């Protein structure tokens, strides 16, 4: 078991940690390729606990032992091989221009929601 505290700089939606950041923490705790799932918002600047689950899984729990997220080792069938090709710069710009969120952020101050 180990405690982590997500610093405010990794904020996602108001008062919670960025989901991508937390999924990365969970997958890293599995010790290799993993499949992560969030179940609830992870608070900022509050200790939460990473603890072992069944069959190599990792659980992220709060002080009340509620499971906030989990990760488990991924088998090869869950990982595309080869991975999908990234979009071209032109494709990414076209998508951004067409997005309803291109000019505004849903969550101001979010680590990656810009």
What role is predicted for each listed range?
Residues 1-3, 63-65, 72-114:
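Non-catalytic linker/capping segments at the edges of enzyme domains
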Residues 2, 9, 13-35:
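Active-site helix/loop of acyl-thioester processing domains in fatty-acid/polyketide metabolism
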Residues 17-20, 49-51, 82-85:
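Surface-exposed beta-strand edges and their flanking turn/coil or helix-capping segments
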Residues 21-23, 51-53, 75-77:
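General N-terminal targeting signals
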Residues 30-41, 109-114:
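Generic hydrophobic segment detector
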Residues 34-70:
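Hydrophobic beta-sheet segments that form the core/acyl-binding groove
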